[in-house]
A protein has these predicted regions:
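N-terminal, charged low-complexity regulatory/assembly segments
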Residues: 1-136
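Hydrophobic packing positions characteristic
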Residues: 82-209
């Protein structure tokens, strides 16, 4: 008799990749009374499983999703999830390796568009880490304009950018929140800068310097 933990682990594996598991699926999964086979029922669960993970990725990378478009973003996300399935108890870390995955997926010729997409993914990943990480809310902190003090804070992260990413990110987020057309937001200029990502009152802030 298979214990519950083993059965759960097996079922998760089947949802990710049912190929080669057909016989066990027929033995362990009860077919419905509507004519659906056990494989059909597992396929429904599998589709829902991946759809939910793509939704998590869209939540973590909303500006990237708007920039790439829903279809292309979903293709990248599904390919990424197949290589890096969730391993942690929280889905906050699901997109941890997504910027690196996109970097390795770049064309061999280093074009600006691909570099921009990778940097944008990196920025949104850092924003997610700062949002879910330690912060200054219980301590005295300096105003959000004093960059030297901000950089000295343990929870601050920095990123070297080849584009004015902070402006583009903020403009797209504003368009999303107000129901505007994100396609009207101009792509950022290819001007290098460094961006500090930090937190104030549980909100993530960006400061270019």
């Amino acid at each position: 008799m298979t214990d519950l933990r083993e059965l759960q682990q097996w079922f998760v594996q089947v949802l990710r990749s049912p190929v080669g598991q057909e016989q066990l699926i027929e033995q362990r999964v009860v077919a419905g009374g509507n004519g659906m086979s056990a494989m059909d029922r597992v396929a429904i669960y599998g589709s829902s499983y991946y759809a939910r993970l793509v939704q998590v990725m869209e939540t973590e990378f909303p500006v990237l999703q708007q920039t790439l478009g829903e279809e292309l973003f979903s293709q990248f996300a599904l390919s990424y999830i197949s290589h890096y399935p969730p391993q942690d108890y929280t889905l906050n870390k699901l997109g941890e390796y997504f910027p690196e995955f996109l970097y390795r997926s770049k064309p061999q010729e280093d074009d600006q568009w691909s570099s921009f997409i990778v940097e944008l993914a990196h920025l949104e990943r850092l924003i997610n880490e700062v949002y879910h990480g330690e912060g200054p809310e219980r301590e005295e902190h300096v105003p959000a304009t004093e960059i030297e003090a901000i950089l000295s804070e343990a929870w601050t992260k920095t990123m070297q950018c080849s584009f004015q990413l902070h402006r583009y990110y903020l403009d797209v987020r504003k368009a999303i929140s107000t129901g505007g057309d994100t396609s009207e937001v101009e792509l950022p200029e290819a001007i290098s800068c460094r961006v500090a990502i930090f937190r104030r009152d549980y909100k993530v802030k960006l400061h270019a310097f």
